[in-house]
Design a protein with these regions (language model features):
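Sensor-1/coupling segment of RecA-like P-loop NTPase cores
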Residues: 79-117
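Winged-helix-like regulatory helical subdomains adjacent to P-loop NTPase cores
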Residues: 158-190, 198-201
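Short capping/hinge segments at domain boundaries that bridge a core fold to an adjacent linker or tail
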Residues: 161-162, 187-194, 199, 204-252, ...
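Alpha-solenoid helical repeat architecture
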Residues: 191, 204, 223, 262-263, ...
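Amphipathic alpha-helical segments of tetratricopeptide repeats
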Residues: 215, 306, 334-338, 366-374, ...
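Helix-turn-helix DNA-binding segment
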Residues: 660, 730-816
């Protein structure tokens, strides 16, 4: 008994145990379930149990007067005739008789329903259905026992094994039932009248077919779309392509005549190859109504084209570009560049140019718009203005935007025009003036359904970062990330969010953003450059030389294939500073010359020039080259009257040079560092304060500078716990009482930080600068670590630390 129970679904085991007492306590059991859910297995176990208990098992109702030592076990009761079902129902009323019946749950079969009601008077039915299954098997098995068994018993791949088993089982069904399943696997919205109209049968006959289809358990609403598709494909393979097409064509025609066709049904029919003018029109309307959902919009437009729609290629290219399928979008757009329709040709240029910018080829985008020439469509002229400005052609950008709009002033057109006008204002107007216009583009961004070179959120955030307005930058890009943009810009928004956090010293959060942006599919060139540059910046700030080199070379590879534009100056600046650290500036010199020429061609706008010149100051300092620092310092000084950021950077640059000359004025450093933090450069601000602490011989000033660095870091973590939070070591070198180490670890959190940096070979002075503590305090920590570990020498201590920390480092690498 125990062995047989292991094959039985849990829901039926209790009933089988009760059957052992059937000779003295008759039992009535009803088992329902779809195809391959285990009904026959349960009945086999029931027969064995009843026979062991001494009863004679019959497969059909016995004649009247049969001795009570018999039991009825009926399989596939739904196949019995109405007369047989009536007779069986009458025998169920005999309290002396044990009856076990299994059937599909056909609720519209009157005679079967009478039997089930009679059996359920004694106990509720036992319903067999899908079993819990691993996620990777849900789409091919839906948890159905017969498919799970096939997958486990066959040497084929799970999907193939399940497909073969499904086809084998479906071949047992008659053609009308297969036709009904074929239609109902398309959508759950079809009912009896729909099947009747499509198959040309009576409603009564259709009701029976629908009942059988649902009773099969193959089209449950809980099944995944992928499994329903596999059911449909299996039936199509059985009935053949011609019959499949005939049934779906009949369904489409009947649906068009009696009711609106749902988007899901229209999609499936078009994707199965049906061509019909009315179907194409329906899909086109649905696509136009789902512009906010770019992936579904692209699928609908593609299906409409397959169904025979004309003139939708531009809309499809737009939708594909917004989904991030730039290759397909560019291919469609290129095919339309020779279109005789000027409007279609202009839209194709806009799509192709936008994709080119996303792929890091702004030069090609400018060539496309130059070839097109002036065009009155607002979306086209605005996109062209953005491209020409990014490429350094300010005169053409302004001329392009002067064209009178030919189309209606829609919200999308207004958004694009505000974005282009705001961008031009950043070239020669005060930042507040430009941001007021750019802000209007953000307010209507959701109305955009046509692709442009960059998202409004990204361009506004870039302008805010370049202007030293971290509050605005955080707000705009934070909302964009939370709202979830089209796939084309999702990674860009994450990278910009990470960039802001990196500049503010929130390195763990910045790392999380760049990791999220880099996960999954291959990055397009613009995103690849930003991701590699951001990782380079993070590595430089954490002092990870190996990672710095790795990411810098990756960024240089992306940059080598990149057509430099105005919107890539931030990553270029970080690569410049890293190159100076690595003594590799020569490799970047040509690109730097291009960047400076680009800025000159735009009239050296203060907003876009400041960040690159600040990078030049840093690069010159790292290269120990005062003559390299001077021109960038002078450029910043020249822009002080036009830019708050230039004022902060100019003052900070002079202060930094004095600090390096060991001329540390605490008030001056404090003012410069706080100004840097105010413009979003908290990471640079803390480094300036830390550098000042190292360069002064006055312990009091050194302590004040370290405290300043801590204050700046804590003030910009925005809820993220800082690595050194809670530590208050005085600059005098007296170590604080150590915190209790975590359970299982001999080191406190601070000692672990010191140990990790010690293993990197960093001297006490650099460790102190990193952790904003004095070198003397680092020395005390090292002594305490050695004492805690019981190491007899420094080399023994380092060996023990490597043994302790190496496994954790390995785990971290594996996670990455």
């Amino acid at each position: 008994m125990t062995d047989s129970l292991t094959e039985v679904p849990p829901a039926a085991r209790r009933a089988l145990l009760e059957l052992a007492n059937a000779p003295t306590v008759p039992v009535k059991v009803l088992i329902t379930g779809g195809i391959g859910t285990g009904k026959t297995t349960v009945l086999a176990a029931a027969r064995d149990t009843l026979r062991r208990s001494g009863l004679t098992v019959l497969a059909c109702p016995p004649p009247d007067g049969e001795p009570p030592e018999t039991a009825l076990v009926i399989d596939d009761a739904q196949l019995l005739t109405d007369t047989e079902l009536l007779r069986l129902t009458e025998r169920v009323a005999d309290s002396r008789l044990t009856v076990v019946a299994a059937a599909e749950a056909r609720e519209h079969h009157r005679a079967l329903r009478a039997l089930t009601m009679a059996l359920e008077r004694d106990r509720p039915r036992i319903s067999l259905g899908p079993l819990p299954v691993a996620e990777h098997l849900r789409d091919c098995t839906a948890g159905l026992p017969f498919l799970i068994h096939a997958v486990s018993a066959r040497a084929q791949a799970p999907a193939q094994a399940a497909k073969v088993a499904l086809i084998e089982r479906l071949r047992r069904l008659d053609e009308p039932t297969l036709d009904t399943l074929l239609m109902m696997s398309l959508t759950h919205e079809l009912g009896v009248s729909d099947v009747a109209a499509a198959l040309g049968i009576s409603v009564t006959d259709a009701r029976g077919l629908v009942d059988r289809a649902h009773a099969s358990g193959l089209i449950e609403s809980s099944h995944t779309a992928a499994f329903l598709q596999s059911v449909h494909d299996a039936i199509a393979q059985i009935v053949g392509n011609a019959h499949h097409h005939e049934v779906e064509t009949s369904l489409l025609r009947s649906q068009l005549d009696i009711s609106p066709v749902s988007a899901e049904l229209a999609l499936r029919l078009a994707e199965h190859g049906l061509r019909d003018e009315r179907l194409a029109d329906i899909l086109t309307r649905y696509a136009a109504d789902t512009r906010d959902a770019s992936v579904r919009c692209a699928r609908l437009y593609r299906a409409a084209v397959h169904a025979g729609a004309k003139g939708l290629t531009v809309r499809l290219a737009d939708a594909l570009a917004r989904t991030g399928d730039c290759t397909a979008a560019a291919t469609l757009a290129d095919d339309l560049l020779s279109s005789p329709d000027a409007t279609e040709r202009a839209a194709a240029v806009r799509v192709a140019a936008s994709v080119a910018v996303h792929d890091g080829n702004t030069g090609h985008a400018a060539e496309l718009f130059g070839w097109l020439g002036p065009h009155p469509d607002t979306m086209v002229s605005s996109a062209a203005t953005i491209v020409f400005a990014a490429n350094g052609d300010l005169a053409t950008a302004r001329a392009t935007l002067r064209l009178k709009d030919a189309g209606p002033p829609t919200m999308a057109a207004r958004c694009a025009r505000n974005l282009a006008e705001g961008l031009l204002l950043t070239m020669d107007q005060p930042y507040p003036v430009a941001m007021a216009k750019l802000g209007q583009a953000i307010a209507t961004e959701q109305s955009l359904s046509q692709v442009i070179p960059d998202s409004p959120a990204a361009l506004v955030t870039l302008a805010a970062i370049h202007a030293g307005d971290p509050v605005r930058a955080r707000s705009v890009i934070g909302r964009a990330v939370r709202a979830g943009a089209d796939p084309l810009f999702q990674r860009r928004h994450l990278l910009l969010s990470g960039w802001i956090k990196m500049q503010e010293g929130q390195l763990p959060s910045a790392s999380a953003d760049v990791a999220a942006a880099s996960a999954g599919t291959h990055l397009h060139r613009r995103d690849a450059l930003w991701a590699a540059a951001l990782q380079t910046a993070i590595s430089r700030r954490t002092g990870d030389i190996g990672a710095l080199q790795q990411h810098w070379y990756a960024a240089m590879e992306a940059l080598a294939e990149y057509s430099l534009d105005l919107f890539a100056l931030l990553p270029l600046g970080e690569l410049w500073v890293a190159a100076a650290r690595m003594r590799q500036v020569d490799q970047l010199q040509h690109t730097l010359d291009q960047a400076l020429t680009l800025l000159d061609s735009l009239g050296t706008p203060a907003l876009w020039s400041n960040s690159l010149h600040w990078a030049g100051v840093h690069a010159g300092i790292l290269a120990n080259s005062p003559e390299s620092v001077a021109p960038h310092g002078q450029a910043l000084g020249a822009m002080v009257a036009h830019s708050t950021l230039a004022q902060a950077l100019s003052d900070a640059g002079r202060t930094w040079l004095r600090v390096l000359a060991e001329n540390v004025d605490a008030d001056e450093v404090t003012a410069a560092a706080r100004s840097l933090s105010h413009v979003g450069l908290t990471s640079d601000a803390t480094r300036l304060a830390g550098q000042a602490a190292l360069q002064t011989s006055d312990a009091r000033v050194s302590g004040a500078m370290l405290q300043l660095a801590r204050d700046l870091k804590l003030g910009n973590d925005f809820g993220e716990p800082p690595s050194g939070a809670g530590d208050t070591e005085p600059a005098s070198g007296t170590p604080p009482a150590p915190r209790q180490p975590p359970a299982g670890s001999p080191l406190s959190d601070r000692e672990r930080e010191v140990a990790e940096l010690l293993l990197l070979g960093m001297p006490y002075r650099d460790i102190g600068a990193r952790l904003f503590i004095s070198a003397k305090t680092v020395e005390h920590h090292v002594a305490r670590i050695r004492q805690r570990l019981g190491a007899g020498s420094r080399s023994e201590m380092l060996s023990m630390l490597r043994a302790m920390l190496a496994p954790e480092s390995l785990t971290a690498d594996e996670r990455r």
